[in-house]
Amino acid sequence: MRAFLALTPPERLVDALSTLVSGLKCGRHVDDDDMHLTLTFFPDVSLAELEELNLTLEMIRTGPVPLHVTGVATFGSAEPRSLHTVVAPDPALVHLQKKVETAARRSGIDLPHRRFVPHITLARFPNRMPPEDHAKIGRFLEAQGDFQFDPVMVDEVVLIQSTLSSDGARYDLLETYPIA
């Protein structure tokens, strides 16, 4: 199965991000309930591996971590794939990410080697977009690229299963781990 460990932003941040992205008139916007900051992604994980990981995650107590949104950007320059918030790589956030990644590897989970880029995805774009959608994204970034939101604290990590479909991914909460 596909799954990931993430932080779920507090409702007041989700509300602000939802209002922000409503100004973008293209792409497939992420539902409010699906907004998250991925700590580590498991492209193919077994239930046995998740059970092993569960034991370790129940013991992680790093304390709450701040999410500080410092801007809006895209992944993919010539052909943007997604629009996301830029989240400051606070030392507490980076420490938590390294701890959960290490816990996953020690549980036998084979993880892709990716650099941690803290972000919250707001919208996804098709592989090919008409020029007018490129222009809309450009205008949106010009107007909103410096969007900021005061740091908010998150005190739990969530384990989410991701099921792909033609309508995009469906997320199902599997477990919650308090970190405070």
Language model regions located:
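Histidine-dependent nucleotide/RNA phosphoesterase domain, centered on the 2H-phosphoesterase fold
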Residues: 1-180
